[in-house]
Amino acid sequence: MLIEQITQALTAVRQQKPLVVNITNYVVMNNTANALLAIGASPIMAHSKQEMVEMMSFAGALVINIGTLDSVWTPRMSYAVEQANANGKIVVLDPVGCGASSLRTETSREIARLADKLIIRGNASEIIALAGEQAQSKGVDALDSSDAALGAANFLVAEYGASVVISGETDYIVTKGQTVQLNNGHEMMPYVTGMGCTLSALTGAFAAVGDDTGLAAAAVLGVVGEIAAEQARGPGSLQMNLLDELYQLDEETLAKRLKMQVS
């Protein structure tokens, strides 16, 4: 049943071409915009408070990524979340580097508190830090394994009413009463910058067509990353192949290659 929902969500994104508003970091804007286009969605990078009322009135979802955070960005992010709330739209929070500095940690928590409908997507160290536990981090990279963050993820589900996606060698999608484990992807993927940020952007696209868990996006990127790596000579060709495979992915291939366990 879950597999059918995932494949239907892929078709829905391509048919509906939802607009996804991204307040994201300078490093990954190009990557995430291209990934959204390749999957069939419509990206816009909107950072101004002056246009956010209009943007969130017709956008499908809001993605907040704190990767290049500063004091100018913070009030814009909060205001955007308020407008998403006013329009009943899902907010996807990517707490990049949460735990590496108090600014990142407190900003992430403030956004999580503000959002009415929330999906949190982070690596294990970010999820652990967001929940207030001691995490091992090296900049924005995780030093904790995905399963080490399951307790923290369940806390965030209860605390914020959120769905939580823990990405890593194994991906976990944690919702109230259910945990889904995905075992796709490839060991080369962490060598391409912004791979997690790309997942967060895709999560926004799938949220816009009804997936309020983050499962469909994680399933798609895991399968696509696996396929893209088969012909890749290194991170450069993997990044290029990834866009092609996002564009080419069909329901049958997704269902056939998906490695999923539910508990």
From Swiss-Prot:
Disulfide bonds: none
Binding-site list for substrate: M45, G194
Superkingdom, taxonomy of origin: Bacteria
Keyword annotations from UniProtKB, A to Z: ATP-binding, Kinase, Magnesium, Metal-binding, Nucleotide-binding, Thiamine biosynthesis, Transferase
GO biological process: thiamine biosynthetic process; thiamine diphosphate biosynthetic process
UniProt-annotated binding residues for ATP: R121, S167
CDD domains to which the protein is assigned, alphabetical: THZ_kinase (cd01170)
Cofactor(s) this protein cannot do without: Mg(2+)
Pathway membership: Cofactor biosynthesis; thiamine diphosphate biosynthesis; 4-methyl-5-(2-phosphoethyl)-thiazole from 5-(2-hydroxyethyl)-4-methylthiazole: step 1/1
Catalyzed reaction equations: 5-(2-hydroxyethyl)-4-methylthiazole + ATP = 4-methyl-5-(2-phosphooxyethyl)-thiazole + ADP + H(+)
Enzyme class: transferase
HAMAP family the UniProt entry points to: Thz_kinase
Function: Catalyzes the phosphorylation of the hydroxyl group of 4-methyl-5-beta-hydroxyethylthiazole (THZ).
Family membership: Belongs to the Thz kinase family.
Protein's recorded name: Hydroxyethylthiazole kinase
Source species taxonomy: Bacteria, Pseudomonadati, Pseudomonadota, Gammaproteobacteria, Vibrionales
